């Protein structure tokens, strides 16, 4: 599908006109200055993402994502590894990588400079017998500067995050100071198993590996109370607010679902640790301009800079060396 970007911009402009005058002034003031790091998106060339992107008003292409970044002052993005065809080098289970710009080149990085990646884990293929060799597979990429973390997919993969088959990867994460992002909460597939994706399971791993940073992706949606408690209790646990919505939510959706966002706000305020929250989109799932606006209503204005930018630099520490003066 060919996206008409002029029409898309008109739709966004109409959306902003509907906002209160004070909100318009705030958006204009922040939009001109505030840098954004998207701490959770996908950069995966797969047929299903074409439909997902179209529903959000986009194309699932590298060019489209770059235009989104230019329009929204997104200076860096963390892409979650999704590919399944990475060859094995050491007899272990290879990681999942990214490939939207081109098939991944593990010798000369051929994805955009403003995108880093988390190594995706195929947990159900790892055993206690091959876990050590799997860690070697991951270490090959962990030595590369564009690798900024590790991503585990409980729920989509019927394995708990704290399962001992993951322990060599946690040791690797500790050695290379890489955070471990963990899918939690709702899944896009009815074949998934929700019990593996409950945010309370992250507490087990975080307590066993206190020197490793863990990220509760999607704030455990809809288990916000549990997710914020785990982050409040564990100094090494953080939260991203990616993927809470999909398609083009718009202001009408926000108004109709205000109770949902109020509930989220209650638990974020209960936690009271705005330094532990990161912006993420889960692109191509959602329209970026609308999602940024809605999360600005959830996170207090005085914490926008750390939420949209600074906290990701702390959690995904390698980003600092990849920003190229952006």
What name fits each language-model region?
Residues 54-56, 63-92, 115-122, 148-149, ...:
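Divalent metal-dependent hydrolysis catalytic cores, especially in the metallo-beta-lactamase
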Residues 44-47, 84-87, 124-126, 157, ...:
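Active-site environment of divalent metal-dependent phosphoester hydrolases
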Residues 90-196:
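Active-site gating/metal-coordination segments in enzymes
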Residues 44-60, 91-92, 187-189, 249-253:
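Acidic/histidine-rich helix-loop elements
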Residues 148-149, 162-278:
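Catalytic pocket-lining loop regions of alpha/beta-barrel enzymes
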Residues 40, 69, 150, 173, ...:
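Conserved, mostly hydrophobic/aromatic
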Residues 2-16, 20:
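Positively charged N-terminal leader segments that act as targeting/secretion signals
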Residues 9-12, 27-76, 266, 270-278, ...:
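Mid-to-C-terminal alpha-helical segments outside catalytic/metal-binding sites
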């Amino acid at each position: 599908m060919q996206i008409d970007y002029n029409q898309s911009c008109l739709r966004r402009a109409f959306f902003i006109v509907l906002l209160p005058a004070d909100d318009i002034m705030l958006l204009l003031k922040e939009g001109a200055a505030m840098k954004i790091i998207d701490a959770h998106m996908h950069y995966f060339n797969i047929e299903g993402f074409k439909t997902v992107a179209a529903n959000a008003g986009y194309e699932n292409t590298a060019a489209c994502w770059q235009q989104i970044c230019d329009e929204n002052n997104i200076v860096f993005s963390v892409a979650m590894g999704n590919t399944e065809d990475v060859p094995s080098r050491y007899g272990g289970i290879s990681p999942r990588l990214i490939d939207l710009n081109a098939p991944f080149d593990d010798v000369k990085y051929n994805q955009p400079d403003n995108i880093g990646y988390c190594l995706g884990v195929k947990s159900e293929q790892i055993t206690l017998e091959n876990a050590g060799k799997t860690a070697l597979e991951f270490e090959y990429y962990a030595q590369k500067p564009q690798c900024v973390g590790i991503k585990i997919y409980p729920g989509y993969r019927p394995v708990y995050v704290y399962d001992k088959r993951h322990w060599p990867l946690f040791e690797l994460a500790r050695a290379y100071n890489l955070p471990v992002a963990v899918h939690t909460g709702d899944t896009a597939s009815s074949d998934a198993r929700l019990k593996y994706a409950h945010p309370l399971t992250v507490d087990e791993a975080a307590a066993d590996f206190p020197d490793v940073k863990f990220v509760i992706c999607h704030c455990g949606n809809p288990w916000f109370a549990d997710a914020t408690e785990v982050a409040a209790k564990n100094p090494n646990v953080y939260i991203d607010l990616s993927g809470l919505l999909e398609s083009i939510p718009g202001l009408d959706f926000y108004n109709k679902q205000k109770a949902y966002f109020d509930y989220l706000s209650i638990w974020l305020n209960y936690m009271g640790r705005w330094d532990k929250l990161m912006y993420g989109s889960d692109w191509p799932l959602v329209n970026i301009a609308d999602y940024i606006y809605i999360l600005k209503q959830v996170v207090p204005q005085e914490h926008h800079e750390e939420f949209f930018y600074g906290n990701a630099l702390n959690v995904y520490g390698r980003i600092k060396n990849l920003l190229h003066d952006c």
